[in-house]
Amino acid sequence: MEMFGKIACFVVFCMVVVAPHAESLSCGEVTSGLAPCLPYLEGRGPLGGCCGGVKGLLGAAKTPEDRKTACTCLKSAANSIKGIDTGKAAGLPGVCGVNIPYKISPSTDCSTVQ
């Protein structure tokens, strides 16, 4: 029985050490993923590859914390990049056929995002 306990402890140890560590979403990932949207949001070009970035963001933001981070990054970008059409930004998820649980807007309260 003692040998079984040692083997069980070793197996658990290996699972903890070998298990991949989930990384949080970063603002850099959010902004680089949505960079193809900038010409569209500034009224300078077509939608192009933008929807791929929007869908990628939705897939990457798996946890409530990731969604809050993404929201905060998008809100910051909307406030700092001049010339963005906020109506187009808010409508981006619908145009791309995805459901993001918050409005892309400078006025969004990201602390309420789940």
From Swiss-Prot:
Keywords: Disulfide bond, Lipid-binding, Signal, Stress response, Transport. It comes from the Eukaryota. Belongs to the plant LTP family. Plant non-specific lipid-transfer proteins transfer phospholipids as well as galactolipids across membranes. May play a role in wax or cutin deposition in the cell walls of expanding epidermal cells and certain secretory tissues. InterPro entries: Bifun_inhib/LTP/seed_sf (IPR036312), Bifunc_inhib/LTP/seed_store (IPR016140), Plant_nsLTP (IPR000528). It holds the Pfam family Tryp_alpha_amyl. Disulfide bonds join C27-C73, C37-C50, C51-C96, C71-C110. The keyword Signal applies. The keyword Disulfide bond applies. Induction: By abscisic acid (ABA) and drought stress. One of its GO terms (biological process) is lipid transport. The lineage of its organism: Eukaryota, Viridiplantae, Streptophyta, Embryophyta, Tracheophyta. Residues 1-23 form the signal peptide. This is Non-specific lipid-transfer protein 2. One of its GO terms (molecular function) is lipid binding.
